[in-house]
């Protein structure tokens, strides 16, 4: 494996080195060997390699090329905060630090291949180090957003039988409070400049850990990552990905959608707990690009725009919600010296936002669409015609179709389920399964297809046009929110007799959580405004704050089927004027 990737990187280095030195558009770089190999795998001309490890077969090769002067002097990782502190690592330094982190996981934490480590950290350099350390050791990483509540943490630690967790001072007390209920949890890593009883201080050990470590030889199909994803019923599901699905699957998105080369500096503003953070890591580093990170304790438009002016960022990826905030500023006041490519994903982007951004910056916004279960499904690739409002065309190796409820392919113009063909050959860059949930895994397949759960139609030119979810999941500012999670939180308040939670349109967030609530008799006469605020604050204390209902309506009864099931679809259609 290392031989063909070595060839890929030597070829990739011949691309546009002078991106900061020339002002004309450089010629398209040659397709590197990794993309050629990936395409051969997707076409069945070359089998998926038996062994693959992204840290060993990609990152360490770039490190060797740096030593021989065959890569531009860009950092591989560049972190900044609002106080002027910066951290820069070359691929060689990234390798050294991640090997030290790997020794901590194996030594102080006692983790073995296949053990599971939960990562709940804000945008700190240690998050990226630990991700690479997991690859080197065969430890399965489980990223989580930093807004998780004590209840959320407990469920995830128990469901995934997590052996160790790495987090910061903010969440450590929550972990302490529930650790007795999580028997699988054997060690706790703290990223902090201070110590805490019962915790292993990651930074202290990193300073003295050995930089020598032998990377585990992992099989392509070995488990590499687990992501919790919200659904319409019950608790979040565990999506398992392999070394190959992410390690090789994101190479193409890095080239085709993000247009990255080893001269680029790529900034994705997403939270570390979301799958898009992994998109950045694999897409950028597979193509030798630099991953840029701003700590962003609070996301605001001015910080984003000033950062784009101050640093030589060439490519940025934001959720549409953030672009909606950015275009409300006077963008002509900001001069982006190096920015040349803009990306959006996580939800549909409004055409007016794209137009405003282009009119003031001269830059297109290229949308990409994917899921926790997949890599890039379709996108508006660089160099292709953008149809405003479309998600673009299918991304190989996926054969993407629009199908009906029986799995039959529909003609252009017909609305149906977005589906990926999995027979006769399942794409290597699709998730393995929903862990411990064979029923959910089976239900996601219909005939020859994996059903995404999203609806769209495809036009005559092969462009996909998003319609919406065919279930009740709410996508607010790219946060996926299951209605049952919010309804369960509301049910813990004595004022709530029953509730139904649906999406409601919002000009900034795209959609927000709206709760229709039937009050208990004792609360019917309460002041509705005060009760709304009380219920909103209650939800924030029970589950992650981003899930709270921004809109609340008190009604006498909920619409239901004859069997008593709540008709969320009727309420949702009412909100959206359907």
Swiss-Prot record:
Annotated residues for binding of ATP: 229-237, 367-372, 454, 469, 565
Gene Ontology CC entries for this record: mitochondrial matrix
GO biological-process terms attached to the record: acyl-CoA metabolic process; fatty acid biosynthetic process
Single Gene Ontology MF annotation: metal ion binding
Catalytic activity: a medium-chain fatty acid + ATP + CoA = a medium-chain fatty acyl-CoA + AMP + diphosphate
InterPro entries attached to this UniProt entry: AMP-bd_C (IPR025110), AMP-bd_C_sf (IPR045851), AMP-binding_CS (IPR020845), AMP-dep_synth/lig_dom (IPR000873), ANL_N_sf (IPR042099), Mitochondrial_ACSM (IPR051087)
Keywords recorded for this protein, A-Z: Acetylation, ATP-binding, Fatty acid metabolism, GTP-binding, Ligase, Lipid metabolism, Magnesium, Metal-binding, Mitochondrion, Nucleotide-binding, Transit peptide
Name this protein carries in UniProt: Acyl-coenzyme A synthetase ACSM5, mitochondrial
Organism of provenance: Rattus norvegicus (Rat)
Lineage: Eukaryota, Metazoa, Chordata, Craniata, Vertebrata
